[in-house]
């Protein structure tokens, strides 16, 4: 088995944060990320620190956050040990890059990506470790061309790791980003995986690199194609309404959000994924035959691209 190299993972994640921020700033052309570096105080339940970077009021991006964090603790939170009882009583480290981008233009999809590494150690025993992550796309006015190119990029980056990887991680994404109380997916999916340790460490690490670097390759061409489409109040209102689904998912179902809040994580960083504005409307129904109705009819159930 290849050696576990926590330092190399951390260095990659920090450089990935830098690279993604630079590419998004370049695409936006106006806004820049403002960094909020943070460190946990000694004696807190969770140690460590991170770099939260937030961009606001750009030409294209209304708000976006790209967060790096590296935290450690002596005891796992309940959300983690519930499905992994062997982690109880182990000290742990968790590090990752997580980002959500909320564009202004309703024709530009919202996007999310995350890559992370987790290790739990106990003296005299082998460490328990895994990688997780993925990326997913949430359009409000979808184009088949965009969904296809998003998934093509995902397929291509998965291919060197095995023919089964894309279909498995694509299906996992469809299942994970699903709102049971709405009976709809959050968007058109992408990749999602967790507990990745079935390969040697180096291969798992290489896959994480491919996913992290593949995010901008998948997303920025879509932004470029849609950023100049004209829109009015109707499209903006629908965008804000659909952003409400993002809020519902993150606060009710997202394991990362629950893990962060239960383990005493940094609330501002955990909730940076929230849209700056969202709205709810009682018993909303899209008009038959409208572009809004098409989202519901064609894009909010899992499909092959």
Curated annotation (Swiss-Prot):
Residues passing through the membrane, by range: none
Signal as UniProt keyword: no
PROSITE patterns, sorted: COPROGEN_OXIDASE
Keyword set, alphabetical order: Cytoplasm, Heme biosynthesis, Metal-binding, Oxidoreductase, Porphyrin biosynthesis
Top EC class of this enzyme: oxidoreductase
Reaction equations catalysed: coproporphyrinogen III + O2 + 2 H(+) = protoporphyrinogen IX + 2 CO2 + 2 H2O
Any one GO molecular function term: metal ion binding
Cofactor(s) annotated in UniProt: a divalent metal cation
Predominant place of localization: cytoplasm
Region (Important for dimerization): 246-281
Residue positions of the active site: 112
Subcellular localization, as worded in the UniProt entry: Cytoplasm
EC annotation from Swiss-Prot or TrEMBL: 1.3.3.3
GO cellular component annotations of the record: cytoplasm
Record-annotated site: Important for dimerization: 181
Ligand binding (a divalent metal cation): 102, 112, 151, 181
Positions contributing to substrate binding: 98, 114-116, 264-266
A Pfam family of this chain: Coprogen_oxidas
InterPro entries in alphabetical order: Coprogen_oxidase_aer, Coprogen_oxidase_aer_sf, Coprogen_oxidase_CS
UniProt record similarity statement: Belongs to the aerobic coproporphyrinogen-III oxidase family.
Subunit (UniProt): Homodimer.
Functional description taken from the UniProt entry: Involved in the heme biosynthesis. Catalyzes the aerobic oxidative decarboxylation of propionate groups of rings A and B of coproporphyrinogen-III to yield the vinyl groups in protoporphyrinogen-IX.
Protein name per Swiss-Prot or TrEMBL: Oxygen-dependent coproporphyrinogen-III oxidase
């Amino acid at each position: 088995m290849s050696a576990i190299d926590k330092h190399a993972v951390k260095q990659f994640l920090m450089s990935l944060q830098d690279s993604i921020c630079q590419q998004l700033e370049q695409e936006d052309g106006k806004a820049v990320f403002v960094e909020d570096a943070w460190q946990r105080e000694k004696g807190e339940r969770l140690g460590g620190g991170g770099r939260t970077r937030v961009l606001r009021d750009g030409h294209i991006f209304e708000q976006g956050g790209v967060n790096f964090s590296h935290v450690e603790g002596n005891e796992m939170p309940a959300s983690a040990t519930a499905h992994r009882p062997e982690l109880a009583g182990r000290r742990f480290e968790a590090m990752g890059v997580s980002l959500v981008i909320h564009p202004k233009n309703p024709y530009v999809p919202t996007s999310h990506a995350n890559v992370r590494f987790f290790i739990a150690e106990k003296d005299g025993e082998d460490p328990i470790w895994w990688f997780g992550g993925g990326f997913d796309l949430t359009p409000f006015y979808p184009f088949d061309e965009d969904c296809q190119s998003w998934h093509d990029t995902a397929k291509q980056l998965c291919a060197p790791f095995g023919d089964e990887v894309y279909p498995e991680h694509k299906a996992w994404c469809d299942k994970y980003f699903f709102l049971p109380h709405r009976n709809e997916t959050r968007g058109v999916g992408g990749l999602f995986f967790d507990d990745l340790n079935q390969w040697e460490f180096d291969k798992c690490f290489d896959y994480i690199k491919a996913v992290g670097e593949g995010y901008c390759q998948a997303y920025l061409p879509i932004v470029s194609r849609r950023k100049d489409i004209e829109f009015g109040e109707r499209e903006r209102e629908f965008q804000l309404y659909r952003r409400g689904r993002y809020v519902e998912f993150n606060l009710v179902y997202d394991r990362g959000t629950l893990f962060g809040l239960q383990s005493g994580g940094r609330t501002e960083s955990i909730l940076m994924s929230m849209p700056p504005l969202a709205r709810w409307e009682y018993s909303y129904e899209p008009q038959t035959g409208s572009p809004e109705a098409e989202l519901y009819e064609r894009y909010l159930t899992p499909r092959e691209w």
